[in-house]
Amino acid sequence: MNLAAMDPSNYDAQLAEKKRKLSEGFAEFAPPELEVFASEPAHYRMRAEFRVWHEGDDLYYYMFDKVLDAKVRCEQYLPASTLINAIMTSLVEELRPNHSLRHRLFQVDFLSTLSGEILVSLLYHRQLDEQWQVEAAALKQRLSSQFNVNIIGRARKQKIDLDKDFVVETIKVNGQDLHYKQIENSFTQPNAKVSIKMLEWAIDATKQSQGDLLELYCGNGNFTIALAQNFNRVLATELAKPSVGAAQYNIAINNVDNVQIIRMSAEDFSDAMAKKRSFRRLEGIDLDSYNCNTIFVDPPRAGIDDETLKLIQGYERILYISCNPETLKDNLQTLSSSHKITRFALFDQFPYTHHMESGVLLERK
């Protein structure tokens, strides 16, 4: 983390530099003009993690600054949501004098929402006992006078939920409220307002679609729920069990009735589609009945494996969201032989860092 780089007065300049890098880096694929979606310059991150430093009676949050090569005390944190910044102060003031809650505490994680819920995870280098649970419950009650908060305690092979281990986010996408269960310690989009722009862009990019949608790496259904309106049916895959559970929950609370989630990896699904192997998890699902002309992928930073790339090339339209321009560029070396880029976007999910979230719509040549 480079804390000095987080200067809102430099936001436009750093975004312009990202635009230049992405445009120049993908020029060989002759994409259309880059669509740029900016972030708020401050208080844009809905998640934050802090280490905890103990110094006598004092106790405080810190981060490690790679540029300074030193730990930096954090009373407030500019990228974090206003809700995280508000509870940071109240929480640390509660922890300092409380031996049971502070003893061997080494990290605090926050997961907040635009809808006002916040989840606090306290991580310890010791096993948590009954006294900890009593003190944590009292802490939650005191904080609840100001915040809609839940607390989780974690230690090695131990997790204690005082109430629940998730928040429910509500966002407005093209005027429609969408609800998402977000589970502690599972992936969620960190920049909620930019995530809304991503969803709206994806909806617009697929609005003229026909037939069904195949989605790989669907996570908690973030895009699945939003895109379902543009297709007859959606078939989505995800490997992580907590994310599949959250996706099923999100399908239900959003009253979406045309989505089928399958718990399996993209690689295994590629084998199933190629009829190389049969899978018990696909019993009762007729893959041949789906008429998927469009495929949506939002892979991890490592990008897409070769076999899955071959699968993807079989579709007329490919919507690809990437958190790593290098692996996207590598994958496009293959995909560009059969498809051309017709939409190209930069989403500034991670201001003041080198990370760039991008999106491309590819259509068969």
UniProtKB/Swiss-Prot annotation:
Pfam families: tRNA_U5-meth_tr. Keywords: Methyltransferase, S-adenosyl-L-methionine, Transferase, tRNA processing. It is an enzyme of class 2 (transferase). HAMAP family: RNA_methyltr_TrmA. One of its GO terms (cellular component) is cytosol. One of its GO terms (molecular function) is rRNA binding. Dual-specificity methyltransferase that catalyzes the formation of 5-methyluridine at position 54 (m5U54) in all tRNAs, and that of position 341 (m5U341) in tmRNA (transfer-mRNA). This is tRNA/tmRNA (uracil-C(5))-methyltransferase. The keyword RNA-binding does not apply. Belongs to the class I-like SAM-binding methyltransferase superfamily. RNA M5U methyltransferase family. TrmA subfamily. The active site is at C323 (nucleophile), E357 (proton acceptor). S-adenosyl-L-methionine binds at Q189, Y217, N222, E238, D298.
